Amino acid sequence: LDAVDRIVGGLEKKTKVMTDEEKRSIAIHEAGHATISWFCRYANPLVKVTIVPRGQALGAAWYIPEERVITTKEEELDQICSLLGGRAAEELFVGAISTGAMNDLERSTKAAFGMVAYTGMSEKLPNICYYNNDEYSFQRPYSETTAKIIDDEVLRIVNDQYKRAKQILTEHKDGHAELAQLLFDKEVIYREDVEKILGKRPWTSRSEELIKENERLEAEKKAKEDADAPKLEDMPDEVKQAQAEHEKAIADKTRDNNLDKDSKDQSTENTKK
């Protein structure tokens, strides 16, 4: 994970000085992301949370991005809710919001805009795509009236998920507080730490389902190979004899090697004396 951290997040800035108040605020923010993603079924699985500054970030939560062939509306909403978990935690448990959520707000707004303008997931503009592949065009492919509807729908989606994030954090405020304190003390926590505090997730992630399915297929493949492999008792006598001689030769060679090693060790010991 250290190599991935350096590539994705940049080098650690251990010399960056923070007050305990700033450090606690960042811990509460990152614990907010971790808590929301833990209780949102379709949020990417959590791997690690840190409040050690890297690059431009003062803290970060690392997830396993799930490579989905398609993405449902529920999955998009869970990701937006998870992104807003840090800002929601600041409002609820710090009592003041900060600029630390800027990247989260940018990503959640872009995701909501994509749902409304590109993938037809809006209640007021269903099944409509306003995507314009002319990157040099200064004209939007919709009217001012539609632009107002898009703005309103983006705002509604973000606000709804922000309220949802605050509700989840309120329901699990004790777990969040314990998580934030552990993060404040240790600076880095992992999935196992989150599971000890918040309990096992009531569902498996898509990544976990794919891993289990792959393990099942591998087990079936091995069982079939074992079943198709010729058994010793079914082999001709000459093959059985050759197999036995081969195994005996390996055993003899191993024994001789061990004897040579013991002899050399004894000779070395006598020389020292």
Please place each PLM-identified region on the residue numbering.
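P-loop NTPase nucleotide-binding/switch module
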Residues: D5, G9-D20
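Soluble catalytic regions of large protease machineries
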Residues: D20-I28, A34-K273
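C-terminal helical "lid" of AAA+/P-loop NTPase domains
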Residues: L1-A3
